[in-house]
């Protein structure tokens, strides 16, 4: 199944890339546990890492600080390794409300969650690839340090089918039920199977467009074939197939029975403690809730909130780390921590927040003490589990620098010859009017501007002021969700507006070559938003444009400003020197605008059932208001056909969207007639 990593790129390493690749590979081969790649914005850090992976042929996990950057990295790695297994592993919750108890108001909040089926399929695909192949790159978020099913139990539960194998049809169906597959002879979808005579069709949980057909003759597997679940067309005939469980948390029956006995023992011990402390209500609550869960586990093999008993189900002792995605990574795997100055502190913070919430649940009798072991990894456990690691950042944190022993691989020269932005410091007193004149200069030559402020209030007031003066401006704030945020960034790049105002959102990983000016208001107010790293990251947003410039408005130069300006000057000098020595003229990046959103949409939206190919739907806004009645009628017929098509494919959400649009078009048609 595995193939060698094969890098697909029209470019060869250039600038600082060849030296960075050589040093990183030497370090890995010498057994260095930690290395840091200091790569400036736009220097091709992902390409450097892809070259290292391809040269060393090692399975790799890439950790990103959020889903947006993970999606961007996943898309880039997919392009670099089209023939290899590039997988995506992030939290599959679109919405998640953990269970919690607020003692002050005696309020218990039930767990509530909405799971994105497509991301669940991608997670299953990621672990399958890690177990089966060596040519695998998994792009993950911090979700990777949360508990996952034990890989040993997961492997034990697999169902292997081979042609010529002697097995009873009922035995196959029983095994599929144990893997949590559901029988559904009407709607054939991911994680289900259907039976027609001696033919069993199985839709693997980790697949989105291929299903398995098992043809039996008496008690022998006569033929195994892969087919398209939408058309029913046979794609290929195969000699063997492995069916993986529908979920990572599947457990063999004997393990569940053993776990139930251990849960009963813990319940008896905990009841004794609560009664000794005269906590009668808590004792009664805990007994009732746990007995209900045990009954469900006995009857169904699982219960709601079964993850709270994960310590017993995986056979771990108290306080032992939970199995995570790191347990699926081979021993010689490689870990790349992207934007490490953000990702590393995130990993450290996850355990403490989770622990505080669960201690309250245990104290007030909502959960057994063993629920505390259903948790993310502690930071020291992450350190112990992490294989050889490369930290990647334009502004590495103290932790990474300390771990790398101060020996940092510098990647400052960009292949395009682009220089770091010119930095100017201007007085605060006239900052708004000065900014307005700078914006007008940029808008006149079709370039974009980013403005970062210190407070929400100031961002709102500035946006209003710029609008009053005729500028096309938008305001980006924390209440905007990820998809809308991506759309705003796309609109900025497309020139729908010229100025984007934000607070702390215009930083890591945003790829906007059209931005030629970054303005930082109140740059001399020392603090988190104006620290050396924040300033360098924000200034870096203008580094992808030939005319890149950053204006820092401040009445004095703070230590953070001095360090940020000094570091930018150091990089700029090195870049200029390299360009002069090699006769390079800086070239602006001409990156397609669709790149940002196309991938995010594929991942963010649950793919349709069956074939799983979501079709683009025309938005109502895209229909011109002045269409003739004849054109409107034609449009209505088109959309009616598309709606019926979606309905036949059981894609009811898409069909409903078109139905709502048809109502609007019919109203327009009546008005126009």
Curated annotation (Swiss-Prot):
Q: Where is this region: Disordered?
A: 608-627
Q: Does the keyword Zinc apply?
A: no
List residues of the Helicase ATP-binding domain: 26-183
Q: Do you know which InterPro entries this protein is assigned to?
A: Helicase/UvrB_N (IPR006935), Helicase_ATP-bd (IPR014001), Helicase_C-like (IPR001650), P-loop_NTPase (IPR027417), UVR_dom (IPR001943), UVR_dom_sf (IPR036876), UvrB (IPR004807), UvrB_inter (IPR041471)
Lineage top rank: taxon: Bacteria
Start and end of every UVR domain? Answer: 633-668
The record's subunit annotation is: Forms a heterotetramer with UvrA during the search for lesions. Interacts with UvrC in an incision complex.
* Protein name per its UniProtKB record: UvrABC system protein B
> What organism is recorded for this protein?
Escherichia coli O7:K1 (strain IAI39 / ExPEC)
